[in-house]
């Protein structure tokens, strides 16, 4: 999995760049879905980064809670609040200290590509926090989500990287399920209920479907209607990084599936779309 999170701020100028999406429905992405993935999937994983890596919390030296709102015209809106070395994301920008507006989903996606430099419409006085804390934090996240081979030789780094990748992919599944045309079609075939994505003896996430709308809960599911269980964290990481195939893992028993086949089948279809967005 490759995810870009190179964010730059410049108080004197702003530059933007965009790429035109082209191709067929099943092999290309749309900018609106990508914006939802980038905000809730990628930047939303900052919550988990701060919880897993002490170096992340050390970057957050603000003594009072400080919140950054991201408002995308025709797209998502969310606020990340930083407090006591941790952070929390919530939908909406009604209560934020710093607001970063984007005129389109394409412009917001450029933020994470490093090709768009945003200018705050509110809270310009907090530019120091953006430069000294937020940007280094996103750089650290990018290091884990786009790891160098040498870094992955460190077992501790590899474990954190895999966990963050799992959380990012799990949230991306819901965004694709709700916004991507092909994903919406697959979600329309999934009955109400919880789908568990678990790692044996380790972490787990829940995909909750209600009225053909999906949300991701970053916690294990006690009573799922369907479940996908990885034998260990390493297998989960290999699958999400595209190093092994799901079918091969199912055949050798490193991934177990149970419950309603229809739910698992359609989630796998959505996961295929996720891999294209995060490639």
PLM segments and residue spans:
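Feature captures hydrophobic
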Residues: 4-9, 15-279
């Amino acid at each position: 999995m490759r995810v870009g999170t190179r964010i730059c701020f410049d108080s004197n100028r702003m530059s933007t760049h965009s790429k035109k999406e082209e191709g067929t429905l099943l092999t290309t992405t749309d900018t609106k879905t990508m914006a939802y993935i980038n905000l809730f999937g990628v930047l939303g994983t900052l919550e988990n980064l701060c919880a897993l890596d002490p170096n992340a919390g050390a970057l957050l030296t603000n003594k009072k809670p400080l919140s950054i709102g991201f408002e995308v015209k025709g797209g998502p809106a969310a606020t990340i609040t930083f407090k006591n070395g941790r952070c929390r994301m919530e939908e909406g920008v009604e209560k934020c200290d710093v607001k970063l507006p984007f005129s389109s989903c394409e412009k917001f996606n450029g933020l994470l590509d490093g090709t768009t430099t945003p200018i705050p419409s509110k809270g310009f006085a907090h530019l120091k926090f953006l430069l000294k804390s937020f940007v280094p934090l996103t750089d650290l996240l990018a290091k884990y989500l786009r790891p160098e081979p040498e870094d992955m030789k460190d077992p501790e780094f590899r474990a954190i990287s895999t966990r963050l990748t799992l959380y990012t992919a799990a949230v991306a599944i819901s965004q694709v399920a709700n916004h991507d045309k092909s994903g919406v079609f697959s979600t329309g075939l999934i009955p109400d209920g919880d789908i568990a994505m678990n790692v044996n003896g380790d972490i787990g996430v829940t995909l909750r479907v209600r009225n053909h709308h999906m949300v991701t809960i970053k916690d294990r599911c006690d009573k799922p209607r369907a479940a996908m269980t990885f034998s260990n964290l390493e297998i989960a990481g290999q699958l999400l990084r595209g190093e092994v195939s799901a079918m091969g893992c199912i055949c050798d028993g490193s991934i177990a599936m149970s419950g309603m086949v229809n739910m698992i089948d359609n989630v796998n279809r959505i996961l295929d779309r996720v891999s294209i967005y995060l490639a």
